[in-house]
Amino acid sequence: MRRVGYIIEEIVEPSNMEASFRQVLRGSKRKRSRQGCYLLAHKPEVLEELVAQIASGTFRVKDYREREIIEGGKLRRIQVIPMKDRIAVHAIMAVVDRHLRKRFIRTTSASIKRRGMHDLLAYVRRDMAEDPDGTRYCYKFDITKFYESVKQDFVMYCVSRVFKDAKLVTMLESFIRLMPEGLSIGLRSSQ
């Protein structure tokens, strides 16, 4: 497939930036927080600053804090970034996600809107009904600490094969290389 360019223009569109602002600040708890109150009071300036940073390719996730959560019986260490940075990351990843989704095979389901476990289950059931002998056995597995084991260089190779916009690739590299090894859990880019 061809590499995609001119993505920055899509990212900095006012509609995309506005949607990202609303998505990050959804819910009354976030709006009442100190960061949320500041962002709401200075919305035009914040969006203007983020648009300028993204358009010039200088946006970087500056700082994060780690938090441990228990989800599904597993202990996970996630990285939490400030809301202002989260708006920019969301704006970038919304457009990147739209371009990547076209390249996924139909049975890719994890973390994809209007797909997921039940959508994939329908495919598995259909395949089992159509070919009972070929689907008699299955192998159930779980990759332990998957995001921590992903090779950053391989992800960068994949990103550079899809996108040719150098500014975008540089910003995505800053998301990918945020952690010493593996991918960050908590950034939208890990989904």
Give the ranges of each region predicted by the language model.
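Conserved polymerase palm-domain catalytic core
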Residues: 127-191
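Short, conserved non-catalytic motifs in the polymerase core
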Residues: 29-37, 62-89, 103-115, 175-191
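Non-catalytic, polymerase-adjacent accessory regions of viral genome-replication enzymes
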Residues: 1-48
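Active-site-flanking structural segment that lines cofactor/substrate pockets
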Residues: 43-74
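Active-site-proximal segment of RNA-dependent polymerases
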Residues: 3-8, 89, 93-141, 145-148
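Non-catalytic, well-ordered alpha-helical scaffold segments
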Residues: 2-5, 18, 44, 48, ...
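Generic hydrophobic/packing signal
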Residues: 54, 58, 71-73, 84, ...
